[in-house]
């Protein structure tokens, strides 16, 4: 994915100087570009949500909301795709360390609510794989644009945990409960073209058109009435806020799963590049069973 035309250097102003994993670029008319990229010199690699990236993805929307010079934000990935899944070392730390698990739960909650409550409109530009924490911002964005060949994947059940994060709060609203259950429970990939067809994203375009379209939309939003646009976003996002209890439940169940046996098998299978085997785990094993026919008959005679 080529760099956006006309972009400025990384923003080092007071709002964004502390960001390390996210690259920030200011554009004319109040457009801020947020770029997720690989670590170190390998910027073209998929952006993996390690501990630092996860923290920054949750925090950036508060700073954008406070930034008087930003009217609209674009979030995109660098290199081969939009975003990779969570860093496996972070997943293992969550599985073994309660403090880490509690911290990441709080960040996961904040990421969803901070995107929803950010008063500035957000445009996402997704290409290649779109997975993990980056996908949260990608699908919760006010205008979501994907290439037709993008691969949107909610990988929670493949890892061995419930589909938390943004899944329960936005998938049923965007594409309906039947499609949401199909893709979330089976961990099936969705192409950008199919995502547009079912209503999961706003637009699907050919890859060369992705950034030009994202900036075209952003410029229109930046040039429009800011009170009208922001108040429209606020009102529409009450649909998402009303799903808050479902989201909180899904996130709690997801993070309860990080303390269970399935996530260890999920991590091992990803490291070994094989299908997971969850056959040995059954959370309902050992539950009280109904009485036998003989016992039931005896109860009726007494």
Which residues does each PLM region occupy?
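C-terminal long alpha-helix characteristic of the crotonase
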Residues: 145-150, 201-249, 255, 259-261, ...
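Glycine- (often His-adjacent) and acidic-residue-rich active-site loop
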Residues: 41, 45-52, 69, 77-113, ...
């Amino acid at each position: 994915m080529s760099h956006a035309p006309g972009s400025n250097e990384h923003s080092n102003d007071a709002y964004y100087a502390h960001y390390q994993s996210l690259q920030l670029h200011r554009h004319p008319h109040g457009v801020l570009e947020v770029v997720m990229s690989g670590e170190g010199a390998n910027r073209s690699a998929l952006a993996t949500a390690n501990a630092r990236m996860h923290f920054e993805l949750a925090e950036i929307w508060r700073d954008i909301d406070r930034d008087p010079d930003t009217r609209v934000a674009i979030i995109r990935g660098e290199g081969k795709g939009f975003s990779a899944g969570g860093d496996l070392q972070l997943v293992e730390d969550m599985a073994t360390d309660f403090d880490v698990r509690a911290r990441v739960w709080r960040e996961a909650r904040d990421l969803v609510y901070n995107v929803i409550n950010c008063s500035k409109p957000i445009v996402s530009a997704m290409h290649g794989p779109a997975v993990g924490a980056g996908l949260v911002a990608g699908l919760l964005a006010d205008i979501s644009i994907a290439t037709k060949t993008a691969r949107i994947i909610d990988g929670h059940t493949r890892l061995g945990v419930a589909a938390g994060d943004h899944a329960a709060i936005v998938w049923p609203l965007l594409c309906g409960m039947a499609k949401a259950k199909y893709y979330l429970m089976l961990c099936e990939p969705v192409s950008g073209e199919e995502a547009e067809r079912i209503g999961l994203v706003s637009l699907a375009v050919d890859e060369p058109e992705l950034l030009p379209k994202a900036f075209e939309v952003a410029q229109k939003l930046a040039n429009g009435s800011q009170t009208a646009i922001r108040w429209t976003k606020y009102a529409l996002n009450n649909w998402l806020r009303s799903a808050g209890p479902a989201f909180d439940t899904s996130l709690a169940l997801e993070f309860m799963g990080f303390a269970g046996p399935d996530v260890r098998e999920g991590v091992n299978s990803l490291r070994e590049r094989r299908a997971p085997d969850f056959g040995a785990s059954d959370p309902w094993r050992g539950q009280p069973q109904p009485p036998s026919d003989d016992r039931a008959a005896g109860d009726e005679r007494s």
